[in-house]
């Protein structure tokens, strides 16, 4: 057993070295892309955009013309930049300020001088929060008149300051419970954002900073309320506002007719222009490429960025542990109900309910279930996101665990139940003391596979704004624009967790088989 564990550790070590080597090597361009010099050259080009942004909408209009223009949509701007650097797309359309931030880290990228389009940013609020919208508008007008917003923007763009506004302390703000209730607030004004959009919102030293964060804090000071910033996927911001998970969204959001049908918007607080980014392929401009050690230092050691992975690892372990407990308990109950009905009849209604549950949970994607539970089931409840993830993954895994355990129960000879009952044991005691131990021993390897699947499925927790291992790597990638290194390390961490879980299952299986000797 010790030798086998040693082999697992060696395998993990060499896998991590391989991933780090691949990250250091990078990747060469697979093909020559179209050369763009002006906006007119976009015809027939492959355009990269961040999903759900203004750039997405504008580029989609070009795609609809049917002249060969194609739009590639990415969840994060950093992913689009990586695709541009690898010549997977011809260009990227984004806002000017983030484009300058991208270029600062990747000198081989160029920003075309011609403006692609002009737009302005606003804060989104639920349509039924008219008082809150009016209050935010009043705050924006005051901040504009006093020059506060212009000062925030200039200090960020011209001087590169991460925090350009210091909010007042909570004891200075005098808004009472009645005023909070009138605005539709509980304790604070919660803003949803997507912290991958430097300089408007991004991570620095473990905190979300940027223009939008400073503007939100300034608005809170004028309104006299505390402000809370929550990070989530960009395409989940409007949904979170609609569901009441947050009161407002501020993430470089542009007002469009389609969005106005579903959500309300405040007055604009910043004017921006859309630009086109291209990869010049200038090796001299890019300079000497950093080696593996430099990349590792940039991704994990600078500003203590490894903390994002540690936080994600902790959340992943907590979610997995409690989801396993929930799935095994619920799956066992369902398996007993189904096995009882198949062997002895009766329990028709409970069996029908169990079958309905299994059909729904196995017939719909895990991510859809997670989003429904968070945005619909717990829409009006202010619950911990880890709790929501445990419930979602536990319920999903229970559907598969139930069928595995049921097959184990059915594999036990029916005479075992009759023997237990003849000894004076009740049905429940016979099932618990005689049938289930044999069933678990028979299906333990299959159960182990399902639990490993559960562990890997927790990687979608970031869609509800929860920092898991994958989300931690996303944060690092959004800061460093380095793709392979964070993803390679996260892949190795998942591999180590899976090997550990697999070793635990094998050890338990070996212990249970001692009874056969």
Residue ranges and their predicted role:
Residues 39, 70-74, 82, 151, ...:
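Extracytoplasmic small-molecule ligand-binding "clamshell" domains
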Residues 54-71, 111, 141-181, 291, ...:
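Ligand-binding clefts/hinges and TM-proximal coupling segments of bilobed small-molecule sensing domains
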Residues 288-517:
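Transmembrane alpha-helices and adjacent helix-loop boundaries
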Residues 31-46, 167-207, 242, 285:
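Immediate post-signal peptide segment of exported/extracytoplasmic ligand-binding proteins
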Residues 21-24:
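C-terminal motif of bacterial Sec signal peptides marking the signal peptidase cleavage site
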Residues 29-41, 106-117, 127, 217, ...:
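Acidic, polar ligand-binding/catalytic clefts
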Residues 96, 100-140, 161-172, 195, ...:
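Periplasmic-binding protein-like
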Residues 55-73, 104, 154, 201-204, ...:
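Ligand-binding cleft/hinge of the Venus flytrap
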